[in-house]
Amino acid sequence: MRDLLNFFDKPKDPLSFDAVRVSLASPEMIREWSFGEVKKPETINYRTFKPERDGLFCAKIFGPIKDYECLCGKYKRMKYRGVVCEKCGVEVTQTKVRRERLGHIELATPVAHIWFLRSLPSRIGNLLNLSLKDVEKVLYCEAHVVIDPMETTLEEGQVLTEEALQAALNEFGPSFKYGMGGEAVRDLLKKIDPEYLSRKLRLEVKDTKSEAGIKKLTKRLRVVEAFKGSINKPEWMMLEALPVLPPDLRPLVPLDGGRFATSDLNDLYRRVINRNNRLKRLQELNAPDIIIRNEKRMLQEAVDALLDNGRRGKTFTGPNKRPLRSLSDMLKGKQGRFRQNLLGKRVDYSGRSVITVGPTLRLHQCGLPKKMALELFKPFVYNKLEEKGLATTIKQAKRLVDQETVEVWDILADVVKEHPVLLNRAPTLHRLGIQAFEPVLHEGKAIQLHPLVCTAFNADFDGDQMAVHVPLSVESQVEARVLMMSTNNILSPANGKPIINPSQDIVLGMYWLTRMRPGAKGSGKAFSSVQEAQYAFETGLVDLQAVCKVRINGTLQETTVGRAILSDIVPKEVPFNEVNVTMGKKQIAALIDKTFRLAGAKATCILADKIMEYGFKYSTAAGMSIGIDDMVIPAAKAPMIADAEKQVTEIQQQYDEGLITDGERYNKVVDIWAQTADKIAKEGMNAIEKQTFNVNGKEVVGPSFNPIYIMADSGARGSAAQIRQLGGMRGLMAKPSGEIIETPITANFREGLTVIQYFISTHGARKGLADTALKTANSGYLTRRLVDVAQDVVVSEIDCGVEDGLEITPIYEAGEIVQNIGDRILGRTALKDVVDAATNEVVVRANQEITENDVKIIEGRGIDKVDIRSALICQSKRGVCVKCYGRDLSRGATVNLGETVGIIAAQSIGEPGTQLTMRTFHLGGAASRAVEQSVHTSRYDGVVKLQNVHAVTNRNGKLTVMNRNGSALVIDEAGRERENFKLVYGAVLNFKEGDKVAKGQTVAEWDPYSNPIIAEVSAKIQYQDIEEGSTMQEQVDAVTGFATKVIMESKSSDVKPTVFLVDGAGKTLNLPGRDIPARYLIPVGAQLLVADQQEVHAGDVIAKMHREASKTKDITGGLPRVAELFEARKPKEAAIISEIDGYVTFGKDVKGKQRVIVTPEVGEQKEYLIPKGKHVAVREGEYVRAGEALMDGPTNPHDILAVLGAKALSAYLVDEIQEVYRLQGVGINDKHIEVIVRQMLRKVEIRDAGDSRFLAGEQVERYAYMEENERINKEGGQPATCSPLLLGITKVSLSTDSWISAASFQETTKVLTEAAINSRTDHLRGLKENIIMGRLIPAGTGLTSYKRWKVSVHEDDDIGFVALPGMTSSVQPQG
């Protein structure tokens, strides 16, 4: 470890140290660093502009103002280097030392460092066992403290007010030592022996019984341990000498008009010096105590303000009423040292300009303005000019370049050739925001960008700007070419799909090229080759869209002329049937994907360029345009709207007669209009998607050539949703609050909107715009937190040897598969052999990567459970291993060692953040509310099988489901499960076990808007505790005059509204097959549907609870939901879940809470208290599994971890997060989320410390815990025990091992205070800390294994090809 001072001597090579430690500086050390004491508050002489001696800018202390010249001018020039002038005392040296030399101020009284005093928990207070208030009283001279009680009964560290002190003096006389102010606190701190105190506190912890006591002692023990384990001494938290920052870091610049601009620090220092000098003078004069106390307090406040202005007391402000920027403010926040200057720097050799389209460029090229290139490549041009002998000196070369002679341009072209440049568009949300291109010089002033890379950059040409950077060294050029070239970034790192996807005009052109037109000119001809067909088209014999036969790759194919032309540019490896379709956006994407998998990257780039060329060419030739007549209004629109209005009137009538509640009416009305809008949209689409063609006098119906339809169908512009607004009806709109307005807009844009309709539209739409602005900031902040939490996850080894993994199944939603198993396991490593159960054949061996072919086989054989390795369970100490991570999605091959998978994961999750909604619900301006699902319809023929279903037969002889976790399966002839329907409580089944079901038949149906309570036996109803006015009220609907019975909250807590099922004699019946009485607790807010003593049949509804008006899925969605999950927040009113498997019974209520008891078959029962008025989701006698919710409400992820463990938690988080992204149609691979969740589960909480060095309740890294326990087990001690912890991403980032990384993230002062007290060492293992220290990051080519390689360029080759390690040709290892 080297000291700060010697650190400044000469610039250190950033690689010459391995770790950085931060600790407290002792007063001796501060004086040792200093080049002299600053005694005066003066800065510079306003007439001579020379610094005042002994002042804040003193040349004697800090160094000369001019290079190699003393202040009085006696010694000038280099030859006197190192001489100290006897007249002015200035050393003759470079001015640069004024940036490095520290001074100091000798304080007249010790002063507390505000960080260690005020940063909670107060470190000084903790050590002295005093409250912060008391320490402040002593420091700010408001109270005395006992330093040494001697023979008296006082205690050391006891705080005495003036009155108490007088009383003590009267009682004991001056036989004890007391004091006030900084000296007293320093003396107390000096007396502390951390070793002894630590032992004492540890014993106290063992003896204490109370929770609070232990917590308090552990808190104190933490601070004591910090001092015990480090080189710090407690009294160093008090400053006796204050370092003064070098003057060039707090400059004073003269402005014109004789005024000065100065750094705020100078003001703060001046204040400290003034007060300090005044205090010294007062002490020399033996001034009265009260004046000295006041002065001491003011000195303490001045030093506080210098270190952290505004932390305590009133903030010091400058002349313009703005708070002064203290030393802490220099480090904190976005404008602080860490984030402004260390993590992000401005760089040389860069420029920026507006971008325009470069349709003639190849994929790896960009257009660079000549003027810009000349400036960027200046040094290279100078060098070439000298080489060619056109200039002999740099000065001469400079002159030539300034004159811009002809030779200069030639040389520039030569220099730029094959020298890649980096293009970057802000905001750089993922790594594809910076890519390398070869520059092509042009005369304009804008940068030209290849249209196909716009998706990756998220660029458009409406005035976007981009920055250019020039990689200088040969190594950086190699990396730019091999790793960053746009042609090497075809696949998206987020999901492994191509990101070079043509859009808009290109898609339109390709679609036009590959459409078929029945009866087009030259239909039915046959051609011997593609060239012949193209020739025929160009001479006008056949139409582009004519159906004909063409010989392609040796076989005669039925196709169109356009498709034949397209097939000519597609690589031979891709089969013709991939090309022989109408090319929409999706089909082109699939074609590019297929080409990449079959023909490789180079062929894909060539194909992409060709597709762009053809796309532009044919979209120009097609001449698409829209007229108002192309928006077809379906004839059926008017009758449909009339019909819907009729239905709405009927529902209104039902409501008026009191048959339904207002909530149900609203739901039904919204449903009717949503369905009507959909129907009209369908009609509208039918009207424009088909067209009748005349082929030789016969009428043939084919796909339409309506331009609007073409644009939407091809995916070039617009969507079905927009077409329905142009020609159908606009439909339902949402208010800014997210509710749906029940009167829809029946007009469309072709008919035009009335004023009221227009305002209904703008109402929701305006909210959308306001949202967008907020969304960007929120999304950016989420990305920043994600990057911070995952920045040190790097692929560190080949195989960690773990024998555990995750079980992957397809994802179902509402009985439909939303994600196949293939998509989830592709590119992952199999944990065990994947075996086909039918034939016992091994499909994939254990520890093999699952490839595209394997996926085909697995899906074909119907295997629906595969065990894979996962980053979540990887046992690597730092980072993850290759096997657990699997495939690098952006290259389609196994991941390399040193790949920064953490940051890629963070970017993949954060980048689509701006596409997610901010709303707490997920609807557009036009409300696209899905009609509530209320039936399960089978999509296959098969046999019904019921799984885990309890049911009763109802009045109509059908089965009513009586439990919550049953499901109905449909099994096909081969015995494979084709459908899996989750059944809700109260669903009515149309089939019994073993019944045959045909495709399209309804298996089950239920009421989606209410949760019913259903009778399980036929019996008579008997009320208990249901009395009108106390627990039930008859609510009379104001409009209809009909009454409904609603249970309300009762005044007394022991009343429970209950319905019993009794027989004729009034004896309570038991539930079928169990000796549990048939009784039903009716929750608050439920609507009773039966009267007292009424006869009911099994399956009848006794009461129903309304679900919220169509807000089922709309709890929190979008971005806030993702943030909530990653921050591991406990939801408000989270559901209580059962920790064990067992049967449910209800116990006696406690304080108005319902007591639910779960009794397992063996073992002890658990009790849960459920808040009053919450709906208990389980019923008496029901069997629940561990982890099942006992009440309605959101799940708390911490509970899942505690009850079901890390795997279940990760599955929950991955599913929940993916669901949000799926709704927006964003594909993210599971492994990215797993990497983040792994980081969230890094720590464990120590339950019992045993013989370890940990404290109970401490949070430690999992591997540190395991290492410590191994050590204890070897020594035969008692190991520590722990419980797993789920931390939110912000918490994880702040509690990382690296203090540099944590300080640059958030809460800078807190992190640095903590680190300094513990004298923490940062071993520079992550990426951020290395960037901050100015080193290469330990990832990719920055890994130690690459450091031995030296790159050389062979001049004799024609091409300037440079190889990377692994390509033997031109790389020699050093040493």
UniProtKB/Swiss-Prot annotation:
Biological function: DNA-dependent RNA polymerase catalyzes the transcription of DNA into RNA using the four ribonucleoside triphosphates as substrates.
Subunit structure and binding partners: The RNAP catalytic core consists of 2 alpha, 1 beta, 1 beta' and 1 omega subunit. When a sigma factor is associated with the core the holoenzyme is formed, which can initiate transcription.
A GO CC term attached to the entry: DNA-directed RNA polymerase complex
Binding site for Zn(2+) 2: C800, C874, C881, C884
Cofactor(s) required for function per UniProt: Mg(2+); Zn(2+)
Record carries keyword Cytoplasm: no
Keyword Transcription: yes
Annotated binding of Mg(2+), by residue: D460, D462, D464
Binding sites annotated in the UniProt record for Zn(2+) 1: C70, C72, C85, C88
Catalytic activity: RNA(n) + a ribonucleoside 5'-triphosphate = RNA(n+1) + diphosphate
Main EC class the enzyme belongs to: transferase
Alphabetical list of InterPro entries matching this protein: DNA-dir_RpoC_beta_prime, DNA-dir_RpoC_beta_prime_bact, RNA_pol_asu, RNA_pol_N, RNA_pol_Rpb1_1, RNA_pol_Rpb1_3, RNA_pol_Rpb1_3_sf, RNA_pol_Rpb1_4
Enzyme Commission number: 2.7.7.6
Single GO MF descriptor: DNA-directed RNA polymerase activity
Gene: rpoC
Species annotation: Bdellovibrio bacteriovorus (strain ATCC 15356 / DSM 50701 / NCIMB 9529 / HD100)
One Pfam family here: RNA_pol_Rpb1_3
Family: Belongs to the RNA polymerase beta' chain family.
GO biological process: DNA-templated transcription
Keywords carried by this UniProt record: DNA-directed RNA polymerase, Magnesium, Metal-binding, Nucleotidyltransferase, Transcription, Transferase, Zinc
The protein's name: DNA-directed RNA polymerase subunit beta'
